[in-house]
Design a protein with these regions (language model features):
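Structural detector for hydrophobic anchor residues on beta-strands
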Residues: 11, 45-47, 51, 82, ...
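Short glycine/threonine/proline-enriched tight-turn/helix- or strand-capping micro-motif at secondary-structure
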Residues: 14-49, 73-74, 120
C-alpha cells in the first residue's frame, strides 16, 4: 500500500512509554522529555513506514544513549521532510544512502544503548520544515496519518488507551483529509 507501521502486528502496538514529559526511567527523581514512543518488542523486524525513504543516519555504536540506531527521511511535496528514528536496535540491515520502501526491513529490535531498561523500539518522528526548522512531534500523530493513507487498522495502546484516537477523531470532523502530522499537532 505504500505505508507501514514500524513493526508488524496483528491488532495493536503495545506502547510502554508515550511521547511527552515523563519520570526518567533511570533516575526517578528527574523529569525528562521523551521525544518518541517506546514499543514493546522481542526480536522484531523494524520496518520503513513509507515508500522512497532515504537512510540519512546509522549508528552502530551500542554504547551510546540510543544504542544502535538509524534514521530514515521522507521528502514532502512542500519542501519539508519527515525523519523517523529507530533506537536500541540489535542489528541494522541498511546503510546511509540506501532508499527504502514501506514495510522494508531496516533491522531488528533489541536492547542496546545506555538509556534502556529492557528490549523495546524507541520510535521518534521529527518534522523538518522547508526553512530548516526542526520539531519533534508525537509519533502517534504521524502514525495516524500513515494508518489513514495506508488503511491500517491497528491501535497504539498505552494503559488501555489508543494513542491514535485523538488524531483519528480529528480526521473524521475536518473536511480536509490531508492534514500533516504537524497540522494535527496544532488542533
Amino acid at each position: 500500500t505504500g505505508y507501514s507501521f514500524p513493526v508488524e502486528r496483528e491488532e495493536f502496538l503495545f506502547i510502554t512509554s508515550p511521547f511527552g514529559t515523563r519520570q526518567d526511567p533511570l533516575d526517578g527523581t528527574k523529569q525528562q522529555m521523551h521525544k518518541g514512543v517506546d514499543i514493546r518488542c522481542k526480536g522484531d523486524a523494524v520496518l520503513a513506514t513509507e515508500n522512497g525513504g532515504k537512510v540519512v543516519a546509522v549508528n552502530q555504536n551500542k554504547n551510546t544513549p540510543g544504542g544502535k540506531s538509524l534514521t530514515v527521511e521522507y521528502a514532502r511535496t512542500d519542501g519539508s521532510k519527515v525523519q523517523c528514528t529507530y533506537m536500541h536496535l540489535k542489528e541494522i540491515s541498511v546503510k546511509v544512502g540506501d532508499t527504502v520502501q514501506a514495510g522494508g526491513r531496516l533491522g531488528t529490535s533489541g536492547n542496546t544503548g545506555t538509556r534502556t531498561t529492557g528490549e523495546h523500539l524507541h520510535f521518534g518522528v521529527k518534522n523538518i520544515y522547508a526553512d530548516g526548522t526542526k520539531r519533534d512531534i508525537d509519533p502517534a500523530a504521524y502514525l495516524a496519518e500513515i494508518a489513514q493513507k495506508g488503511h491500517i487498522k491497528l491501535q497504539m495502546l498505552h494503559n488501555g488507551n489508543d494513542l491514535l484516537a485523538k488524531y483519528k477523531a480529528a480526521e473524521d470532523t475536518v473536511p480536509e483529509k490531508n492534514l500533516s502530522p504537524d497540522g494535527w499537532m496544532k488542533k
